[in-house]
Curated annotation (Swiss-Prot):
Residues 646-659, 779-799, 854-864, 947-961, 1809-1824 have a biased composition (Low complexity). Residues 28-48, 644-682, 719-964, 1406-1460, 1797-1824 are annotated as: Disordered. The lineage of its organism: Eukaryota, Fungi, Dikarya, Ascomycota, Pezizomycotina. PANTHER family: DEP DOMAIN CONTAINING PROTEIN 5, GATOR COMPLEX PROTEIN DEPDC5. The gene is iml1. This is Vacuolar membrane-associated protein iml1. The keyword Transmembrane does not apply. Belongs to the IML1 family. InterPro entries: DEP_dom, DEPDC5_CTD, IML1, IML1_N, WH-like_DNA-bd_sf, WH_DNA-bd_sf. It comes from the Eukaryota. Residues 734-762, 1798-1807 have a biased composition (Basic and acidic residues). It comes from Aspergillus oryzae (strain ATCC 42149 / RIB 40).
Length: 1824
């Protein structure tokens, strides 16, 4: 089976090991790459000998094997022992085992090194398969290479006899034994340089800029080994998997500047689409007889999962079943369900359709593959039933019930799945890739890469709409991903994958889009692969101009080409064919079955090929006569330079054109195209005519071939020169005209084109010009069959002219309105658009190219080329001899200056704009008796380009140029093999292929570990295209030497490296190769060392980077500046501007995991991405940052959000032994305080400030001022709005100095009384009345404030530890005491009061450090209300707050005249690399809460621009380890609220739970302030909803935006709060919950919670032990590896320990323990409770009784007043550190989903009635 059509750039793209390939195929591929270097290709063994013999003679030496205790160097080489070899430091030396007869130490069974020296054909097959390394058979593959380094002197002294020593790991790789004899020799670096190196990694997120830095740091200019471990920055780990040299796998190689690294992720996200088309239920007639779905469920998927398990891959899997259902239009019309509501898209048969998507699993760990297969089987049973039932609930909002009939109207069984050919594959792919537009938000720090696999029962051919193809192509190109297609049907006989599409039938009404200069579809995507079946007399010139570039919205239709099929092969789709029999054989081979087929051999075909198409003409031919028969096979246009006849040109008379003189390179695509597409290839070499020489070119030397072709062309084209001025139409017959006539009854011919020919690397096609007169059309000439024995083309027929035809056809075309007509030859058609008025003359440019009036030229029956009617505005209409010629241009056909009078209106404008040709030929046209579209007075003269193919020729319109590189038009029936192997077929992924892939096998390597987009590419436009089709935007960047707050790049080299890194992380690729050399005229770019920034930063050095249609050029100019030039394709800018107001609205029916029915969703499919402001980004990197007010959003920072969730503590745990005197709440606050100390310790300080601080090392960092309060932020803001103090909240700590230097105190020289006076004085500590859980503490201060004061004001206190020690001494002497007399003095949020004997009477609560507004003493004070100097509450807008705040009209009167502004969080620069392991500053923005209720979540958000993600992840892991010691769980959660998940992830949707019994009105809240009796009563309508969430252990995450007072402007440092509903999170972190305005619950699984834990759980033990010490579990802490990890999907159906025994504390519920629960179990328990009216009513009554009973007063307690505040503390404060007395019942719940006891709920709910902060109330609780 030949190679398929373009095996495009799937990032899953690598051919698997050659276990299924033949040895001959592998060898032929290797030879094909070296043919151009030698006339006689050498064999691999000859190359090896030649390679090994380079340098000096071999030397024999003794090899030692050492371990790391001896030396950490991999290879030790004693250079002094080989002085005669002339070895120098830096030389590359190869090691080969020495072989001796009878040497048992080198037996093939034990020593791989000796075995590798044996030839593969000498080895026995048993030895070949007995070792997994047996495929490295030759010395080239198995040799060991190393770079000479100086030998350490100490080792040389201790071991003088050491010659060569390798580590144990290298010895194991190469099979070396200790003290064995080896041969060494010097080799040239170029000979051993690797072409590709596969590098795999897992359990980490790596951006491509880190890959680039890793290669520069660890691999460049070094030797790499298979299996080599790579560690970068101490945390990024990778492994070398494969090394390729000239297409062969080797064990070691030199990583040269031209080596291409291919990074593969073993922890990626996979989206598997299974197309449930009609064929999925068909039986396999040739195999087992099972339906095709069984191939998926029993064959392909189990094989894929097994390979994942064997490779230890840890992917996340999403599986979606999708199909398109076609409905009977009459049945739909007769029903109550209108077709408009059903669908807005009609299929090719013009029947209503609906697309269905069923999400089976979502982000499930690949290790749960048995569960995945079970779910697939369950859904398959009901899938067909569910999509076939049309259930009408409402005509406006249709839903499709999965269970059956509706109550209101009966369900209708209608429709059936479409075939795979007409499926919705493009929509599914676009849908899956849409979430990548938000890839920088909620970044998963464990998985890298997204792979999309589409499994289809078809054969790889799809009918699609042009709009879908263009939109999907644009989206995938911008987002840098590719798709893998796995087909279950046999491979067809043509190129695949193939997309069939029709011409768009609409056009925009604007002139800009009608103009060819600004519009028009890609010619590459419009070439016809079907006969032109319409017999319309003509295509009007006006309609020819009306081209549409998106077809999204238009009312004007133009001449319909909808009956024409066009064929294209996309670059972004790779294809495989699953054959169960093949892999059954491979399994037998792996199991060493004696009856298994022998690998590396060609298995004889057991079945004969049965033709699927019978053609009468072919059957009537003799086999040997077919080359001389009268059937001519025209070529299908397949490139951008091809014009095609429209439907108006059917039935032109036959004619042919002779190809012009051209030079054919050996690997030229012409070589394989000179044959009939229906003829078997082996037959082609049996010809005896002159053409036989052309087909046997490989047997000749290139020089002989070129000489022969030149002579041949001279003879062929000689007669045309004599007739170039002939104008009289005549019936001149083509050469061999009598022999080439065919019957009109069966005119079936196969079309194939060679227009889409790539430029060859070394040889250009020669050219010449031929003028061809165009005679006036005449009536058709009937043709007759003649003797097929005469050749189709003779030199003796040079006096005859070819004729012109308009009709092309091929055997695989679909049905058309007219049967195809056979022609004796391929013909050229000319369509004159003369009817256009002068005013429209400008729009006529490109009309010929648009109309495709010329399809191909045929030199003979089996050779043809194409005439391209290409637009060229800069080339006026004039004789060809005056036409400027530019290299690499497509074929163009020009109209001569002589025109009839009627055509004079065309004289003033270019007839064929944008056409510049290198190889041009003017060809005279013979009789065309059917050109009757418009009368022709004189035949125009044509300029025909026979170029070998600039696929980016300028003949394309701007829109086509934007899409052309990504979808190429080909002749699927016979695409040349060289063209398919051309790297350009692979687009952006061309460098991911060490050797050409095959379509016949499944690419297991790519499916197991998808490749990341390569760092380099060769895709680049031509110089003229770059000048004419791209908009240039230049600007310059220079480092900011005066930047504040962060270290700016100091040199141009550092700045350049950061700018390149930023672009690589955003999907750009560094451009190399000949194309960029031609455009820039810098030959250093042919193969630049992209891994050496020192070479890139030299003055004048240029770097090109590209992404899709955007190109950036970076030039190092004089000084320290870098000049940036952005090239933006004109079409891209047009598309971007147009897409802002236009998008595709897609309305599929989707059923998510827990959804009971299919729901129609309106999804905006936007193919464009938001324009990135690179000027801002580059200047931001350079240190110019003052002009950005919100860089995180403006520059698309990577953003993640974490929350600290307070957990229930078990005080018998070893880790809590040190907190015996602390209650749960205090331990949680200690944890947050400990984190703030870490943040302050690692706060990023620029080097200048650090040097300044080093001189003043006395003072420690102060803790961040986080205001702790026991009510929610909205309650605090509402209650204390009139007490807001207008101070600057930007002060994170106390003033730097309170007392002057001369007045600083000393511990030894101060008395308690004087110290008490100072502390309570104006320069002392803040004394105020503070409320905590409804208990008011008068005249108290906080522990960390006194600690800071002591540190600042005592000369002999240098640390906070000393301050705490001194504070405890003061406390022992009676200066102050804890308000509850429970604690010593601590540096934290502890309340202390001055003892009565030292207390100074104060008339009012005050803050001693800052001036304040006199408070209303009738109102009890709060920590926020009166301690507001450090509060984040401000009366003016902060400079760092978001400026785009939407002002709202206050709904309640405000006592402040101006609208108050409150910032609830702060930000700081944090250094994630304190140990300086990276070569650049690694800084992130850390956002943290300034107001915090210990009962709620504490919010942390991280954002960064160019920081290493692995370092960030390590930092977060260290935070999590610290927090867990204090009962806090650090969990990653989405930034957006749960109800907005479907905006970014289309396959997810919140699960709605409704209360079966409506709750009663909530109790009247109480609030203790002066306004309690004056304000109106505000009921909390969500009181019972919040109580129910607390019952199921949910804690408050964020409040709704509407919860805050309307006259207060609330903001966060990261933006404005925009939550529509309040959001809660389960204590496990696995489920999010929201309460809607209607009183329903929205629940959503948090898929971000468990990625790291799952990876850690699955981590092999040796990897777990290798973790850094700071991330290991310590004594008294909890190791997440040993705990039950969170499940990755609510659909995982894990077996959970639901019925686990009671804990020692007596808690029966899982929720009480710190164990993760599967989200579905939490949801199920919650939904069951909400669906039980009896249990709900009981809950309402109990909650209401508790609420009303606590209104009288505090709940009675038996504890002393010293142990509990006067009002009441929540259970978390008083209960969990006290073990229950013996005999008391354990606090358990009957319901597993109700984790807490009724006793605790009673205490909590009693606080709710008073507006307790534990109530979760989001409204001000007050009596108003």
């Amino acid at each position: 089976m030949s190679l398929r059509g373009p095996m495009k750039h799937s990032h899953l793209r690598q051919v698997s090991a050659a276990s299924l390939e033949t040895l001959s195929t592998t060898r032929s591929l290797a030879l094909s790459q070296t043919d151009g270097q030698s006339d006689k290709p050498s064999t691999p063994d000859e190359r090896t000998i030649r390679l090994s013999s380079t340098g000096l003679d071999r030397r024999q030496c003794s090899l030692w094997v050492h371990d790391e205790t001896f030396s950490k160097e991999e290879i030790l080489f004693n250079q002094a022992a080989f002085t005669d070899m002339g070895v120098e430091v830096g030389d590359v030396i190869e090691i080969l085992p020495a072989r001796y007869p009878g040497d048992g130490t080198h037996s093939a069974k034990t020593d791989f090194g000796s075995r590798s020296l044996r030839d593969s054909h000498v080895e026995s097959s048993s030895t070949l398969h007995s070792d997994s390394m047996s495929k490295f058979k030759t010395p080239l593959q198995s040799r060991c290479l190393f770079v000479v380094k100086p030998l350490p002197q100490d080792i040389k002294t201790r071991n003088p006899k050491l010659e060569l020593s390798v580590t144990t790991s290298i010895a194991n790789i190469f099979g070396f034994k200790n003290r064995t004899t080896v041969h060494i020799s010097i080799v040239d670096r170029a000979q051993c340089a690797a072409s590709h190196v596969d590098i795999s990694f897992r359990d980490q997120y790596m951006v491509r800029s880190d890959m680039w830095r890793l290669v520069m740091s660890e691999l460049a200019e070094r030797i790499v080994y298979k299996g080599q471990k790579i560690v970068f920055t101490g945390s990024i780990k990778a492994t070398v998997k494969n090394i390729f040299i000239r297409g062969k796998k080797v064990l070691s190689g030199f990583f040269s500047p031209q080596t291409i690294p291919v990074f593969r992720s073993e922890s990626a996200k996979y989206v598997l689409f299974i197309q449930m088309s009609r064929e999925m239920w068909d039986f396999d007639s040739e195999g087992t007889g099972d339906i095709l779905f069984s191939r998926v469920i029993n064959g392909f998927l189990p094989e894929l999962f097994k390979r994942w398990v064997n490779s230890d891959a840890r992917h996340l899997v999403t599986i979606v079943l999708f199909t398109r259902v076609e409905y009977d239009a009459s049945a739909i019309a007769s029903s109550t369900f209108s077709s408009e509501n059903l669908t807005s898209m009609f299929g090719p048969n013009h029947v209503p359709t609906r697309d269905f998507y069923r999400v089976v699993v979502n982000d499930m760990a690949s290790g749960h593959w048995t569960t995945i297969l079970d779910e697939l089987k369950k859904d398959f049973r009901t899938f067909l039933r569910d999509v076939s039932i049309l259930n009408v609930h409402n005509a406006d909002t249709p839903t499709f019930n999965a269970t059956g009939a509706s109550k209101s109207q009966p369900a209708t069984i209608a429709g059936r799945p479409s075939t795979a050919l007409r499926g919705n594959i493009l929509e599914a792919i676009h849908l899956a890739s849409s979430h990548l537009a938000f890839d920088h938000i909620d970044r998963d720090m464990v998985h890298t890469g997204t792979s999309i696999i589409v499994i289809t029962p078809g054969s790889g051919v799809f009918e699609v709409s042009y709009e879908s193809l263009a939109s999907t192509t644009e989206a995938l190109t911008n987002r840098g991903i590719a798709i893998d297609l796995v087909c279950l049907s046999p491979m067809p006989l043509h190129s695949v994958p193939l997309f069939k599409y029709r011409e768009p039938a609409h056009r925009p009404t604007t002139a800009a889009f009608g103009d060819i200069q600004h519009g028009g579809y890609s010619p590459e995507m419009r070439h016809s692969f079907a006969s032109i079946s319409s017999k319309t007399p003509h295509l009007s010139p006006k309609s020819a101009l009306l081209d549409s570039f998106t077809g999204m919205s238009s009312k004007s239709q133009w001449s319909g080409r909808s009956n024409e099929w066009n064929y294209g092969i996309p670059h972004w789709l790779d294809i495989s064919y699953w054959n169960p029999e093949t892999y059954r054989e491979s399994r037998r081979i792996l199991k060493k079955d004696p009856n298994a087929p022998i690998p590396f051999t060609v298995t004889k075909q057991s079945k004969v090929f049965v033709p699927r198409v019978r053609m009468y003409e072919i059957q009537m031919m003799g086999v040997m006569e077919s080359e001389q028969s009268n059937i001519s096979i025209p070529y299908l246009s397949e490139g951008p330079n091809i014009s095609r006849a429209t439907s108006s040109t059917l039935g032109s008379s036959p004619g042919s054109l002779v190809p012009p003189k051209a030079t054919f390179r050996r690997n030229s695509p012409f070589r394989h195209q000179l044959s009939d597409s229906l003829r078997p290839e082996p037959f082609l070499h049996n010809m005896a005519s002159s053409k036989d020489a052309m087909l046997t070119i490989p047997k000749k030397t290139p020089k002989t071939v070129l000489s022969w072709m030149d002579n041949y062309d001279e003879n062929v084209f000689q007669p045309f020169r004599k007739r170039r001025h002939r104008r009289k139409p005549s019936k001149i017959k083509r050469p061999s005209e009598p022999e080439v006539k065919a019957s009109n009854a069966h005119e079936r011919i196969s079309a194939r084109s060679i227009s889409r020919l790539r430029e060859n690397e070394s040889t250009r096609s020669a050219s010449r010009q031929i003028d061809i007169p165009l005679p006036a059309p005449k009536s058709p000439v009937s043709t007759k069959s003649a003797s097929p024995k005469k050749p189709a083309l003779k030199s003796s027929s040079k006096t005859k002219l070819p004729r012109i035809s308009r009709t092309i056809s091929f055997a695989l075309r679909g049905l058309s309105s007219t049967p195809p007509r056979a022609q004796a030859s391929t013909e050229v058609n000319v369509e004159h658009a003369r009817g256009l008025p002068t005013s429209n003359s400008r729009k006529l440019s490109g009309v010929l190219a648009d109309n495709r009036s010329v399809d191909s030229l045929s030199a003979s029956d089996s050779a043809s080329t194409v005439i391209d009617l290409a637009p060229s505005p800069e080339t006026p209409q004039k004789p060809i001899k005056n036409t400027a010629i530019t290299p690499s241009r497509p074929i163009s056909i020009k109209v001569p200056p002589k025109q009839p009078l009627q055509d004079t209106e065309q004289q003033g404008r270019p007839a064929i704009p944008e056409s510049v040709s290198t190889t041009t030929t003017e060809i005279a046209l013979g009789d065309d008796t059917r050109l009757t579209a418009q009368p022709r007075r004189h035949g125009p003269k044509f300029e025909v380009n026979l170029s070998s193919g600039s696929r980016n020729g300028s003949s394309k319109s701007p829109q086509s140029k934007a899409l052309a590189p990504w979808v190429r038009s080909v002749n699927p029936c016979n695409t040349p093999r060289e063209v398919l192997r051309d790297t350009s077929w692979f687009g952006r992924w061309q460098h991911a292929y060490p050797r050409p892939p095959h379509v016949a096998v499944v690419k297991w390597k790519s499916l197991k570990s998808p490749a990341v987009l390569p760092l380099t590419t060769e895709e680049f436009p031509t110089p003229s295209e770059l000048a004419s089709d791209y908009l240039q935007t230049p600007y310059r960047v220079f480092p900011n030497e005066d930047s504040e707050g962060i270290e700016a790049p100091k040199t141009r080299g550092v700045l350049l490296r950061e700018m390149i890194s930023l672009r690589l992380s955003h999907g750009f690729q560094i451009v190399v190769g000949k194309n960029v050399v031609e455009a820039s005229a810098q030959y250093t770019l042919q193969s630049p060392n992209v891994f050496d920034t020192h070479a890139l930063e030299r003055a004048g050095a240029t770097v090109f980077l590209s992404k899709g249609n955007s190109i950036h050029r970076l030039i190092c100019v004089e000084g320290a500046e870098i000049e940036v030039t952005r090239y933006t394709h004109r079409t891209s800018s047009l598309l971007a501007s147009d897409q802002k107001r236009k998008f595709t609205l897609y309305s599929p029916a989707m059923r998510t995991i827990l959804s009971p029915e299919y729901v129609v969703k309106d999804i905006k499919l936007d193919s464009t991405y938001e324009e990135y402001n690179w000027n801002y980004a580059d200047n931001y990197v350079a240190g110019h940052r003052d002009y950005l007010f919100n860089p995180a959003q403006q520059l698309h920072f990577w953003r993640v959000r974490y929350v600290l969730i307070p957990m229930r503590l078990h005080f018998k745990s070893r880790r809590l032994h040190g907190f015996n005197e602390d209650n749960e709440e205090e331990i949680h606050l200690l944890g947050i305080n400990q984190l703030t100390h870490i943040w302050q310790r690692h706060k990023y300080i620029p080097p200048e400030e650090k040097r300044f601080e080093s001189s003043n090392k006395k003072r420690d960092q102060n803790p961040l001022n986080i205001m702790y309060q026991t009510r929610n932020p909205s309650e605090v803001i509402a209650a204390e709005l009139d007490r807001i103090i207008l101070v600057d909240p930007g002060l994170d700590s106390s003033p730097a100095q309170l007392l002057p230097e001369s007045e600083l105190l000393e511990r030894s020289g101060i008395s308690l009384s004087s110290l008490a006076q100072i502390i309570q004085g104006e320069k002392g500590v803040r004394m105020m009345d503070r409320r905590w859980h409804w208990r008011l503490h008068y005249n108290c201060f906080i522990g960390f404030e006194l600690t800071t004061w002591l540190l600042q004001n005592f000369r002999d206190i240098d640390s906070r530890e000393e301050a705490v020690e001194f504070g405890n001494e003061l406390m022992k002497h009676g200066l102050f005491q804890h308000v509850e007399k429970r604690h010593n003095f601590r540096d934290g949020n502890y309340f202390y009061q001055i003892s009565s004997e030292y207390r100074v009477s104060r008339p009012e609560s005050r803050g001693s450090w800052f001036p304040q507004i006199r408070p209303d003493k009738s109102v009890p004070s709060t920590p926020v209300g009166e301690a507001s100097k450090g509060s984040p509450i401000s009366g003016h807008t902060r400079s760092d707050s978001t400026e785009d705040t939407q002002s709202q009209t206050p709904s309640t009167p405000s006592k402040l005249k101006n609208k108050a502004s409150i910032t609830l969080s702060k930000t700081m620069k944090y250094d994630v690399d304190p140990r300086k392991r990276s070569n650049r500053p690694e800084v992130i923005d850390l956002h943290y809460d300034r107001l915090h209720n210990p009962e709620n979540c504490f919010h942390i958000e991280l954002s960064w621009m160019n920081t290493t993600p692995k370092l960030i992840e390590d930092t977060v892991l260290s935070w999590a380890s610290t927090a867990e010691k204090f009962g806090l769980k650090l969990v990653q959660v989405p930034i957006a609220e749960a109800c907005a998940i479907d905006k970014t992830q289309p396959f997810r949707k919140p699960y709605c739970v409704q209360l079966k019994a409506p709750p009663p009105k909530g109790p009247i809240p109480l609030q203790c302030n002066s306004e309690s009796f004056s304000q109106p009563v505000t009921l909390d309508h969500q009181y019972f909803h919040k109580a129910l969430l607390r019952k199921f252990d949910f804690v408050l995450d964020f409040e709704a935006r509407s919860s805050y007072p309307a006259d207060v402007e609330v903001s966060y440092s990261w933006g404005m709060p925009d939550y529509q509903y309040p959001q809660y999170i389960h204590r496990s972190g696995s489920v999010l919950a929201q309460i809607t305005g209607e009183g329903d619950f929205l629940l959503l699984a948090n898929r971000l919670v468990s990625t790291r834990s799952a990876a850690s759980r699955d981590m092999p033990r040796h990897e777990r032990l290798d973790r850094p010490d700071q991330y290991r579990a310590r004594a008294g802490t909890y190791d997440p590896v040993d705990r039950i990890s969170p499940r990755l999907s609510p659909m995982a159906r894990p077996v959970h320990e639901v019925h686990s025994p009671l804990s020692p504390q007596g808690h029966a519920s899982i929720d009480s323990a710190n164990l993760y629960r599967a989200p579905e179990h939490i949801l199920t328990g919650f939904a069951d409770f909400c669906n039980d009216p009896a249990r709900l009513e009981q809950f309402y009554s109990e909650a209401q009784v508790r609420a009303t009973s606590t209104k009288v007063g505090p709940a009675p307690t038996t504890l002393t007043d010293a142990s509990i505040p006067s009002l009441e503390l929540p259970a978390s404060v008083v209960s969990h550190h006290i073990s229950p007395p013996p005999g008391l019942p354990s606090r358990s719940s009957h319901n597993i989903a109700a984790p807490l006891s009724e006793i605790r709920r009673s205490r909590d709910d009693s606080n709710m009635s008073r507006g307790s902060p534990r109530s979760g109330s989001l409204r001000p609780l007050s009596l108003t």
